[in-house]
Regions:
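N-terminal subdomain of nucleotide-sugar transferases
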Residues: 1-42, 329, 333
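Conserved donor-binding/catalytic core segment of Leloir-type glycosyltransferases
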Residues: 4, 164-181, 186-190, 203
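A conserved mid-protein helix/loop that constitutes part of the nucleotide-sugar donor-binding site
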Residues: 18-25, 178-198, 215
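Short, structured helix-loop element that forms part of the nucleotide-activated donor/catalytic region
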Residues: 44, 201-229, 242
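Short alpha-helical donor nucleotide-sugar binding micro-motif in glycosyltransferases
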Residues: 237, 245-250
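Aromatic "clamp/platform" in nucleotide-sugar-dependent glycosyltransferases that forms part
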Residues: 258
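Short hydrophobic beta-strand element within catalytic cores of glycosyltransferases
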Residues: 266, 271-279
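A charged, aromatic-enriched C-terminal amphipathic alpha-helix characteristic of glycosyltransferases
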Residues: 306-341
Length: 341
């Protein structure tokens, strides 16, 4: 079977979407040929049965109309090179080319995992054979055709490493710097912990989109104004393949994104031996109560940091076991089975 994969970025060094390179590698083991159409192409080392076509954003920003035209031309030109279509995250591609795929009798499958959605999401989903997401609270979870999937983490990369020193009472935030990720709540929690005499350090890894640069700058300014610059450090986003050692160096990973997103970083951190505190309702259905974000964030952090060493290790082992159920190998197999029906 031949598959067309449509995605934003193919670049193994991209700090946000670099993980998808690993997804394509995993999927390639199940298909005779994979054609990828991406908005932006960067560094990649994909198998011989994978061919990448870019809409050209790596050469500079053009109008949406230009990209839409290029996309339609490619989907038509390459029509004999694929039997099924898998669109990752961006419903816009289905809204642009769904009518063409229907004429060509190509079944379409959409991956969309986010709490937000609208009537355009509904229109895109209506043309799909199946819709995939990982969260029961995703906007797309409401459709009868939706299938809940594993998050898809590469356990060959994400695993504990005793050679890396884990810093006691260290907290990690790793995500885009955006209001929806709530990094400001972590800063507020650290202030409250400091006032209680609880000593912690926090590392915040991630870049901001252009529309959130002012927000990111305000966080840095807040840290300076509060005199927390020796406690809270900011770092640029790094490629997904470089994150394991960052996870391994921290004791607690914090994710306070709204339910419906179910960030895969939760399970990457768990697989690397972090104690993970997350606000996601999906996550809280899987883990012991000690790892829930309840009441205030600072109370949740203090609770997990003051657990006996034996209990911490018990929770780490539990989390590592849960992360194995969310593996990329399992995800790629389930996607293949669903798309091949």
């Amino acid at each position: 079977m031949k598959l067309l994969v449509v995605t934003q970025v193919i670049d193994q060094n991209d700090p946000v979407l670099g993980f998808f390179h690993q997804w394509v590698v995993a999927l390639s083991k199940h298909y005779d040929h994979i054609t990828v159409i991406c908005l932006k192409e960067g560094t990649h080392s994909l198998p011989e049965n994978v061919q990448v076509f870019s809409l050209g954003k790596e050469n500079g920003n053009l109008s949406k109309r230009v990209y839409a035209s290029r996309f339609l031309k490619l989907t038509w030109k390459l029509r004999t090179q694929y039997d099924r279509v898998f669109v990752h995250m961006n419903q816009e591609y289905i809204l642009i080319a769904g009518w063409l795929w229907e004429i060509l009798n190509k079944k379409v499958y959409m991956w969309r995992n986010h709490y937000a959605g609208n009537w355009l999401t509904d229109v895109a989903a209506s043309t799909c054979t199946k819709v995939f997401c990982t969260s029961r609270y995703s906007y797309t979870a409401k459709y009868k055709k939706t299938v809940i999937m594993p998050v898809g983490i590469n356990l060959d990369i994400f695993s504990p490493d005793p050679a890396v020193t884990r810093i006691p009472k260290s907290i990690l935030f790793l995500a885009r710097i955006a209001p929806s990720k709530h990094p400001d709540l972590l800063i507020d929690a650290i202030v409250a912990l400091k006032q209680k005499g609880v000593t912690v350090t926090a590392s915040m890894y991630g870049d901001a989109l252009p529309e959130h640069v002012t927000y990111a700058d305000s966080l840095r300014q807040k840290v300076l104004q509060l005199g927390l610059q020796d406690i809270v450090t900011f770092h640029a986003g790094i490629p997904n393949t470089q994150t394991p050692d960052v996870y391994r160096a921290h004791e607690v990973f914090i994710n306070i994104s709204q339910s419906g997103m179910f960030d895969k970083t939760i399970f990457e951190a768990a697989a690397c031996g972090c104690l993970v505190l997350a606000a996601s309702k999906d996550y809280q259905l899987l883990v012991p109560e000690e790892l829930h974000v309840t009441q205030t964030l600072e109370e949740s952090i203090e609770r997990v940091l003051t657990l006996p060493a034996e209990k911490k290790q018990e929770l780490v082992v539990t989390l590592e076991g849960i992360s194995r159920t969310e593996s990329l190998a399992k995800l790629s197999q389930e996607l293949f089975q669903q798309i091949s029906k």
